[in-house]
Regions:
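Non-catalytic interaction/Regulatory regions outside core domains
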Residues: 1-130
Length: 130
């Protein structure tokens, strides 16, 4: 798969439409380099830019650790962290076949995270390539 042809904005648009309670969609590569990141219109970031970067780095590093365990426990499908003010979903962009990109999605606490995870998983890279 040629990742240079990925239309990250189109992926964002597809994901943000899934649920109005999605606050933020960030797509990064496996090293944590942000390929695309945008809040839903009208949503205020709760973290400073430095805190946002640190949170993403922690999520990426945690994902790398889980990937090391994959031969024994299987590949990670997603991670859900629920805080008092938001939920954070981290998952591979292209499902089990994509070890190169991570989705980092934040939602309102009331969001139906199971539905969001299921619907995001249904979005395939093939549909989103140029």
């Amino acid at each position: 798969m040629d990742y240079k042809k990925i239309d990250y904005e189109k992926i964002y648009e597809g994901i943000i439409k899934i649920d109005p309670k999605i606050r933020l969609v960030t797509i990064c590569d496996s090293s944590g380099r942000v390929m695309y990141s945008q809040h839903r219109e009208g949503i205020k970031n709760l973290l400073t830019p430095e805190e946002s970067k640190e949170s993403l780095e922690l999520a990426v590093n945690s994902w790398k650790i889980r990937t090391k365990l994959a031969p024994k426990i299987g590949k990670g499908k997603y991670v859900l962290a629920e805080y008092e003010k938001i939920k954070r979903i981290t998952m591979p962009l292209g499902g089990d076949d994509d070890d190169h990109h991570l989705l980092y999605i934040t939602t309102e606490v009331q969001a139906d995270h199971s539905n969001i995870i299921r619907r995001v998983s249904e979005i395939t890279i093939r549909k989103l390539l140029l």
